[in-house]
């Protein structure tokens, strides 16, 4: 997992997300605490529980983006889910246990890639030998056994050199490759996921070990054979053990739309997608054992980060037991005009950079002046204030409308320079911003 300090994590998040320093600090400390815990003695390590986080803030202020960037920084098993996808046990819909099953599947894929990287050199050598066997079939004796000769060995070395230098890349060869596993989707009733996994595993095992001939270019054949040979060098049981250890000690679950599972008002009927889901999440967040197809996974030390807008419901509307399982509360602020201005220019691959790069593919140069960027930021902020506040996502809508004509005629304007200044922004967006009804539908 990542060994970055909280300051380094915040600095990395600052490259992509503007503002929200409090949320970044909380997430950075939580991530660093995962590393700190792993440095403790085994006895003490079992006692240190993660401090789960509840992020509160309106839509479009960076909650999901923080999670997305955190996933890349963490170098640990990470999954993002929407709370609205789940229902109470016994009803149609996903059960909360599938969160851990999906997290384990993703962790296995990540661990497999890491382990394959370690054996890639040996796998590449084995794949080279298989390609050379096809290009230069070894001479056979009368008894059908392969014979070695100095001439054959010398020729093989010449071909090996050509293969490594790419001279044989476009030559077509026929090789035996592993047959693709049988993909079987089984729709199972709630609570029967384990049986479904076993049946899927049974069908996949039926096709395991089968091979079929394929005609491929040497370059593509080598790539496929390297993956195949690397897979053979891995120990499946050891891989599963490492995966479960990584999930239990470093796993991070980000649950979005958490406010949507709050119970609103008094209702006498069953609330299967709200309070029932909260009660199902309780043991998961507190610590329980989930049965997955890779083995039993304990959730005691998995970090849970919940986030929601909480515009209608309040955090206090969550059941008290769940509130206690999310001790760290972080409030994300509404974005200002200055924030919008910074979002347009400061992050890596900012929106203005993206449009400039897209238009450059058709030899059209776009220049955003400081006044133009300020006008775009003000336009987005005004529309948010007058209609629905969707945060930074409004910038996408405003910019797309602003660039519509340039994008449409780009092929006819190769070599031209367009300057997006305050006057240009006012010409294209002024009337829309002033007319509230129009801005509701178009912006």
UniProtKB/Swiss-Prot annotation:
Cellular component terms per the entry's GO annotation: HslUV protease complex
GO molecular function: ATP binding; ATP hydrolysis activity; peptidase activity; proteasome-activating activity
Top-rank taxon: Bacteria
Residues involved in ATP binding: 18, 60-65, 256, 321, 393
Pfam families in the record: AAA (PF00004), AAA_2 (PF07724)
Subcellular location: Cytoplasm
Biological process according to GO: protein unfolding; proteolysis involved in protein catabolic process
Coiled coil: none
Record has Cytoplasm as a keyword: yes
Entry keywords, A to Z: ATP-binding, Chaperone, Cytoplasm, Nucleotide-binding, Stress response
Keyword Cytoplasm (UniProt): yes
Major site of localization recorded for this protein: cytoplasm
Subunit composition and interactions: A double ring-shaped homohexamer of HslV is capped on each side by a ring-shaped HslU homohexamer. The assembly of the HslU/HslV complex is dependent on binding of ATP.
Function as written in the Swiss-Prot or TrEMBL entry: ATPase subunit of a proteasome-like degradation complex; this subunit has chaperone activity. The binding of ATP and its subsequent hydrolysis by HslU are essential for unfolding of protein substrates subsequently hydrolyzed by HslV. HslU recognizes the N-terminal part of its protein substrates and unfolds these before they are guided to HslV for hydrolysis.
Family that this chain belongs to: Belongs to the ClpX chaperone family. HslU subfamily.
Protein name: ATP-dependent protease ATPase subunit HslU
Species of the source: Tolumonas auensis (strain DSM 9187 / NBRC 110442 / TA 4)
Lineage: Bacteria, Pseudomonadati, Pseudomonadota, Gammaproteobacteria, Aeromonadales
């Amino acid at each position: 997992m990542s060994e970055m300090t909280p300051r380094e994590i915040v600095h990395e998040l600052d490259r992509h997300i503007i503002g929200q320093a409090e949320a970044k600090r909380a997430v950075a400390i939580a991530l660093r605490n995962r590393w700190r815990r792993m440095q403790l003695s085994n006895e003490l390590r079992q006692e240190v529980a993660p401090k789960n986080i509840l992020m509160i803030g309106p839509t479009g202020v960076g909650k999901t983006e923080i999670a997305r960037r955190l996933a890349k920084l963490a170098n640990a098993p990470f999954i993002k889910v929407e709370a609205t996808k789940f229902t109470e046990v016994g009803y149609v819909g996903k059960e909360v246990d599938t969160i851990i099953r999906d997290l384990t599947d993703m962790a296995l894929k990540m661990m497999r890639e890491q382990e394959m990287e370690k054996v890639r050199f040996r796998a590449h050598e084995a794949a080279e030998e298989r390609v050379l066997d096809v290009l230069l079939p070894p001479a056979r004796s009368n008894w059908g056994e392969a014979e070695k000769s100095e001439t054959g060995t010398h020729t093989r070395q010449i071909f090996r050199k050509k293969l490594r230098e790419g001279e044989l890349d476009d030559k077509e060869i026929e090789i035996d490759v592993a047959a693709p596993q049988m993909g079987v989707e089984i729709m199972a009733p709630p609570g029967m996921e384990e049986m479904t996994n076993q049946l899927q595993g049974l069908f996949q095992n039926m096709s395991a070990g089968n091979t079929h001939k394929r005609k491929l270019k040497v370059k593509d054949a080598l790539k496929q054979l390297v993956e195949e040979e690397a897979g053979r060098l891995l120990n499946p049981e050891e891989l599963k053990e490492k995966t479960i250890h990584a999930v239990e000690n470093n796993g991070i679950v980000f649950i979005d739309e958490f406010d949507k599972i709050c119970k609103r008002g008094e209702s006498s009927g069953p609330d299967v997608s709200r309070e029932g889901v909260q009660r199902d999440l309780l043991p998961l967040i507190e610590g329980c054992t989930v049965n997955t197809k890779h083995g039993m996974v304990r959730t005691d030390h998995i970090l849970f980060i919940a986030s929601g807008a909480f515009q209608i419901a309040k955090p206090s509307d969550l059941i008290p037991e769940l509130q206690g399982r999310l001790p760290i509360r972080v409030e994300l602020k509404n974005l200002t005009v200055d924030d919008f201005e910074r979002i347009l220019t400061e992050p890596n691959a900012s929106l203005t950079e993206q449009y400039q790069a897209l238009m450059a593919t058709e030899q059209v140069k776009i220049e955003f002046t400081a006044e133009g960027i300020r006008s775009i930021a003000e336009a987005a902020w005004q529309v948010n204030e007058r209609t629905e506040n969707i945060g930074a996502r409004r910038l996408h809508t405003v910019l797309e409308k602003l660039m519509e004509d340039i994008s449409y005629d780009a092929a006819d304007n190769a070599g031209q320079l367009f300057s997006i200044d305050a006057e240009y922004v006012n010409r294209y967006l002024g009337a829309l911003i002033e007319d509230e009804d129009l801005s509701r539908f178009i912006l």
